[in-house]
């Protein structure tokens, strides 16, 4: 099959819609279940490239959770600790494979934004991954293969309409790519830049310490940024993104947005949050929403009389600003990546507030000296890659 008809394009009024191969070749993917839409497939093919490159760069299973053609999260398949399992709503005693851990961590980076996501796996989708996905709100998944048990589980989601796409892992795109805007065709070379440790050699700060875990996290940040709508900044901790700031016109707004997400990720691990007792039968999205509001300045929306009873078994104490600051002050070892240079040191200042110990960015600003000076002030290790990673 060299063409797949779609219900509509980005919006219901954009008809007809289809995906096809211009050269007449067969499509490199198969729809095993459901009927994916235009944006679903944009998410699928962008997310597949991300997880494929993560696997190539690190040798570890990789997963991503995509929404509107940007990753809400991406991660590698390291084991989950007991706190991770509680924060990510893993069922007690659940079997967890490396690829399942990768997806759970990717979705756990920003559970609020991953609502209705598109999942991407670098490796075969197994029953453990499918069982976790079954209980999450998700639009679809792409993987190079599916076990029989996993496929049977996934086919029960959304009343049997869950989108399951299998992509040929051997497929490689043409070296030139095209897209039309306003009837005008744009053509460019496919972004086939290879992201590996050779990009991390130019350490420009006084602190040259770059442990293996930080190198891995830098690669994760850079590959995530390569497939995130620009401008973009990414915070990574222990082989998973913890905050992705996408599609902002201002670099500092990217850094703030991603930093706020990273702060929320860490605050979800606060003992007061772990102690929240939810009413029986509450759905995961409702728990996520309640936690998000509880951590915000609008916490009274879930703590006021008449409100908390709908969510909690007992009224929790508020997490005070002082408690938040004290908890966040413990956060260290975070890696921050940027798809283009930091123009001013204020980005470093903001990143440091969310625990940044390592920064990777292209360099090339006329204010690089100021950026380096700010990193030196806090003992941050910073590498300049010389490679911009815009994505549109």
Where is each model-derived feature located?
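Nucleic-acid 5′ end/cap handling module spanning
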Residues: 220, 228, 235-238, 245, ...
